[in-house]
Curated annotation (Swiss-Prot):
Protein's job: ATP-grasp enzyme; part of the ank cluster that mediates the biosynthesis of NK13650 C, a highly modified cyclo-arginine-tyrosine dipeptide. AnkG catalyzes the last step of the pathway via amidation NK13650 D with L-Asp to produce NK13650 C. AnkG also amidates NK13650 B into NK13650 A. Within the pathway, the cyclodipeptide synthase ankA acts as the scaffold-generating enzyme and is responsible for formation of the cyclo-Arg-Tyr diketopiperazine (cRY) from L-Arg and L-Tyr.
Protein name: ATP-grasp enzyme ankG
Keyword annotations from UniProtKB, A to Z: ATP-binding, Ligase, Nucleotide-binding
Tagged with keyword Thylakoid: no
Gene Ontology MF: a single term: ATP binding
Reaction it catalyzes: NK13650 D + L-aspartate + ATP = NK13650 C + AMP + diphosphate + H(+); NK13650 B + L-aspartate + ATP = NK13650 A + AMP + diphosphate + H(+)
């Protein structure tokens, strides 16, 4: 796996690396890519942020990598689905004790409505030398809060690569296509029903971009609302006796059973039939339990994915359950469980025996703090990660002592993972810059449990590789 220059490559059999390409070839390739990207952004009325910090020189990767990801995702979906189905009923497994949730989350998850879902697992590329695995990647977390931001970045970059005047050499093709990613994203929703996107804080660029794609595919324009606009209205035809609505202007007020919908204070309301969600965990905590319950029933997103799957502790639960999934529940074979074990970073849960063992071994000196990191259970964008090598010995041990308690407040709740030494790649990120030794973090998208496409690679010379910490994004290509 390495970065190549399409302009300098004359044959798929003899690709030319970006580090060996001439300045002139690289400049032509960069100009063609930038022109295609800016044209696409302009045509779709997207933010220029999607053109920032991108490298046009793609990563050439083996097709077998994609096949491994597809197979892995199939098994991951089987494992997670079985765990979610047993979450409340399996008293022996006692998942709520192993992974405690906030009270408002526990109450609403008992009223969920299973819907299509979006997952975006992140993967690391370990340095060569592990004889115990045949997989080239390790999944370090699953992101499932919102499909919009990262998927749209991938759509823009693969579209620019496809539309660039620098043609792909015969025998090579893009690892994903913009059209297939857009189709997958739009498939989360029913185009025959109105769509509302609930947004609370932060930039609206991802939602604006999604709205453009959705309009082009369906001819419909989603209505973007804030969480504070949500209301409930009585409706005898609903299983809960209520329907989810939002504040509307008098001209657009909706009707239910032939009657205008108004709130108790006389506000004209508009019924919500399906929603896309761009909200943080704090946003959900600020909703009333009744509104949250109705979101669970009416929402297009199964809230178990937000409160359970997207929590970093879920990987630890999966790891703990692998033997049970084989020998007790019979949903995986031993070989399939081993694929998941090899492909998931070992994640240690607060309050677990593994956490107690790690603390004991650290005190004994048999393991080093430098070999571990702590990751906020509800963190995102690479923020809040603590590397053991950056902590003092007493500080590290003190954190592990705290993590003996699974009921820690949310802002003190971490998982512990081994620090994975990642492979380094010689990459050109900036124009006219010397190649840098960088690590790469990958991602892929899954819709409805099925692999939907590879995302773009993130590359940086820093230890935490995140686009929000300054990492560059790079598309990928594979042999036909």
């Amino acid at each position: 796996m390495y970065q190549i220059s399409l302009k300098a490559t004359k044959s798929a059999a003899e690709p030319t690396s970006s580090t060996d390409a001439s300045h002139d070839d690289r400049q032509v390739e960069r100009d063609s890519y930038d022109t295609a990207m800016l044209r696409f952004i302009s045509d779709m009325e997207l933010s220029s942020m999607y053109a920032e910090k991108t490298s046009p020189y793609p990563i050439l990767m083996p097709r077998s990598f994609l096949e491994d990801l597809k197979n892995f995702q199939d098994l991951l979906f089987v494992a997670v689905s079985n765990i979610l189905d047993r979450w409340w009923e399996d008293r022996e497994a006692d998942f709520p004790r192993r992974m405690p949730l906030e009270p408002h989350e526990e109450s609403v998850l008992k009223h969920y409505n299973e819907r299509p879902l979006h997952w975006r697992p992140d993967m690391l590329l370990p340095a060569a030398g592990d004889p115990n695995t045949n997989l080239p990647f390790k999944i370090c977390e699953i992101n499932a809060r919102s499909p919009f931001n990262s998927m749209i970045k991938s759509i823009c970059m693969f579209q620019a690569a496809a539309a660039s005047k620098t043609a792909l050499p015969d025998g090579l093709e893009l690892a994903s296509t913009a059209d297939s990613l857009v189709d997958s994203l739009v498939s989360l929703f029913n185009p025959d029903l109105p769509l509302h996107v609930i947004w609370h804080e932060g930039i609206t660029d991802p939602i604006d971009a999604f709205s453009s794609f959705y309009k082009k595919r369906t001819g419909k324009i989603p209505r973007v609302i804030r969480a504070t606009d949500l209301r409930l209205a009585p409706d005898s035809s609903s299983p809960t006796g209520r329907i989810l609505c939002c504040v509307a202007s008098a001209a657009s007020a909706d009707h239910s059973n032939g009657q205008a919908i108004v709130s108790e204070t006389g506000e004209p309301l508009e019924r919500i039939y399906q929603v896309g969600l761009q909200m943080s965990h704090r946003d959900y905590s600020e909703l009333s339990s009744e509104v949250l319950q109705q979101l669970a029933v009416d929402g297009i997103c199964d809230l178990r994915n937000i409160f359970l799957v997207s929590d970093k502790r879920m990987l630890g639960v999966i790891w703990q359950e692998l033997d049970s999934l084989v020998h007790k529940h019979h949903v995986l074979t031993a070989e399939q469980a081993e694929i998941l074990r090899q492909g998931i970073v070992h994640t240690i849960l607060p309050g677990s025996e593994d956490m107690e063992r790690l603390l004991r071994q650290t005190r004994e000196g048999s393991v080093s703090k430098d070999s571990y990191l702590l990751k906020p259970a509800r963190g995102h964008r690479g923020m809040g990660i603590l590397l053991g090598k950056d902590l003092g010995q007493e500080e590290f041990e003190g954190l592990l002592e705290e993590l003996a308690d699974p009921l820690l407040p949310a802002d003190r709740r971490y998982v512990v993972q081994p620090f994975i030494e990642q492979a380094l790649f010689g990459l050109r990120l900036y124009d006219d810059s010397e190649p840098q030794q960088c690590q790469m973090t990958g991602t892929y998208h899954a819709i409805g449990g099925c692999f939907a496409g590879l995302g773009v690679w993130r590359a940086d010379s820093e230890r935490i590789c995140s686009r929000f910490h300054g990492a560059f994004s790079i598309p990928a290509i594979v042999p036909r």
